[in-house]
């Protein structure tokens, strides 16, 4: 009997651990303004070489739970951000370098740093170019001498992105392995990290896909999820399936399986050098987080936490005004167990909230099926005219602590999350008493994204058999997939 009880407790512990959603524990760091994409990440009017600024921002990242820093590149267009012997410095002589400022702060806080050994020229570096490979090695030689004995030095990041369409080419694998071999010779036991893209168009079931992964001489692959890049109109469902498939391959590959989730969206058209990266809605980011965790990733890092999430009141503000602070606040609220974000996390995780009879409105609003980030998903119920009404029959009088409604937002097709919901309770289904009205502030960076969110009325302390929900929107169509009553 005791053995059976112990087994059940172990199983419960295992299931609980499996359900835990790992937060974002790492961020990429980019020093250089390269084009319009970097307008908020690497502002041209801000001194990106200021060591005090970097010490402050790294400390703020540590406060929010980031313990892994990935320096994308140490040089760009002939300017180096460390004391390089063969390239002009990108910071004033006599001042501590940005790389040293980051390493010093990371040392003091127990953080880990991966250093990128580029750019030989610029962001268009090509691993088939002998000059690029040789310059990367030269960077690596100096960086190893300067930083490899630091407590925070965790390894190398090879910044030239490989593409998985349809799988990594032989020359991409060979280029990575040449740099990796030099890294292992210089710093035995130190890890090598890459962050390739292209899963949306990968031929994952092709044996050559698995072979290209297994042929890589790296320790960590942090796959770009490409949700921010919007490689597909509605990328979330496919992204989660692709990560699941790749996770199965990594069980055999002996390489750490990381996710690099893109927490940005665009202020104009995607994937060009003339649009600016801006913070995405946290509802979208949370769906990405849950998805890659369900695939079994070892860690979650992001391009990019620095500047897309920014601590309110920082002496060195970064990112898009107001909304970088708002994304930071939403993320920290989720980390601290905010009920709204907890319910949305549970929805993404597939929790069974049960079903009830709907006496007014579509029965699909309480059938246990939640809509994907796609307005064409069959789970969505559409309401026009700016108003949604439904009545849920709980079957008998019950205590009611919270009511949540799951909505879709897709600006390009006129789908807008309502401005508020009103919750009313009744014992007979005819006479209702209003118990709470909750307003919703929509996210402004919505030019491209489709995402879902919950409007939650909690701490109701109500009792009744019937629950009436009314949602109001001043414009656009309302799409709701489910109403949850607890």
Regions found by a protein language model. Give the residues of each.
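Aromatic-lined substrate-binding rim segments of carbohydrate-active enzymes
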Residues: 51-120, 171-190, 236-239, 245
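An active-site-proximal structural segment forming one wall of the substrate-binding cleft
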Residues: 94-109, 128-155, 292
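Aromatic-lined carbohydrate-recognition surfaces of secreted/lumenal glycan-active proteins
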Residues: 114-126, 157-161, 179-206, 223, ...
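Active-site groove signature of glycoside hydrolases
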Residues: 118-123, 140-170
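Aromatic- and acid-rich polysaccharide-binding/catalytic face
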Residues: 151-164, 197, 206-237
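Substrate-binding cleft of secreted/luminal carbohydrate-active enzymes
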Residues: 225-232, 256-341
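Disordered, acidic Ser/Thr/Pro-rich linker "stalks" and the adjacent N-terminal cap
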Residues: 337-397, 408-415, 437-447, 477, ...
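Trp- and acidic/polar-enriched beta-sheet ligand-binding modules for extracellular glycan
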Residues: 385-386, 414-486
């Amino acid at each position: 009997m005791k053995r059976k009880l112990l087994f059940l407790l172990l199983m419960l512990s295992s299931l609980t651990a499996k359900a835990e959603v790992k937060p974002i524990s790492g961020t990429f760091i980019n020093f250089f303004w390269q084009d319009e994409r970097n307008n908020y990440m690497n502002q041209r009017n801000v001194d990106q070489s200021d060591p005090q600024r970097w010490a402050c921002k790294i400390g703020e990242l540590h406060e929010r739970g980031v313990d892994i820093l990935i320096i994308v590149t140490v040089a760009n267009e002939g300017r180096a951000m460390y004391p390089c012997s063969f390239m002009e410095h990108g910071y004033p002589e006599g001042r501590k370098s940005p790389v040293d400022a980051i390493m010093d702060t990371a040392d003091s806080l127990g953080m880990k740093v991966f250093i990128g050994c580029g750019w030989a020229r610029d962001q268009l570096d090509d691993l088939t170019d002998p000059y690029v490979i040789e310059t990367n090695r030269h960077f690596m030689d100096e960086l190893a001498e300067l930083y490899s004995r630091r407590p925070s030095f965790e390894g190398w990041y090879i910044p030239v992105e490989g593409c998985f369409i349809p799988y990594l080419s032989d020359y991409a694998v060979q280029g990575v392995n040449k740099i990796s071999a030099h890294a292992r010779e210089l710093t035995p036991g130190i890890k090598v990290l890459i962050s390739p893209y292209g899963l949306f168009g990968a031929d994952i079931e092709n044996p050559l896909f698995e072979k290209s992964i297994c042929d890589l001489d790296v320790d960590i692959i942090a796959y770009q999820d490409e949700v921010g890049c919007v490689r597909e109109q509605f990328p979330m469902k496919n992204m989660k399936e692709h990560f699941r498939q790749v996770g199965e391959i990594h069980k055999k590959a002996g390489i750490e399986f990381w996710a690099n989730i893109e927490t940005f969206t665009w202020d104009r058209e995607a994937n060009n050098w003339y649009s600016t990266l801006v913070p995405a809605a946290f509802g979208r980011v949370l769906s990405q987080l849950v998805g890659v965790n369900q695939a079994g990733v070892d860690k979650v890092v992001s391009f990019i936490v620095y500047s897309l999430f920014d601590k309110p009141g920082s002496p060195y503000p970064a990112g898009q005004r107001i909304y970088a602070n708002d994304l930071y606040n939403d993320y920290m609220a989720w980390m601290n167990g905010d009920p709204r974000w907890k319910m949305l996390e549970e929805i993404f995780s597939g929790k069974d909230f049960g079903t009830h009879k709907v006496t007014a409105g579509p029965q699909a609003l309480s059938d246990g099926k939640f809509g994907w980030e796609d307005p064409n998903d069959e789970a969505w119920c559409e309401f026009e005219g700016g108003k949604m009404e439904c009545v849920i029959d709980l079957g008998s009088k019950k205590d009611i602590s919270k009511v949540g409604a799951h909505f879709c937002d897709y600006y390009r097709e006129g789908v807008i999350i309502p401005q508020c919901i009103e919750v009313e309770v009744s014992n007979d289904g005819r006479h209702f008493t209003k118990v709470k009205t909750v307003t919703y502030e929509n996210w402004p960076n919505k030019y491209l994204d489709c995402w879902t969110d919950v409007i939650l009325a909690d701490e109701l302390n109500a009792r009744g058999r019937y629950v009436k929900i009314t949602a109001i929107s001043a414009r656009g169509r309302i799409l709701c997939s489910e109403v949850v009553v607890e």
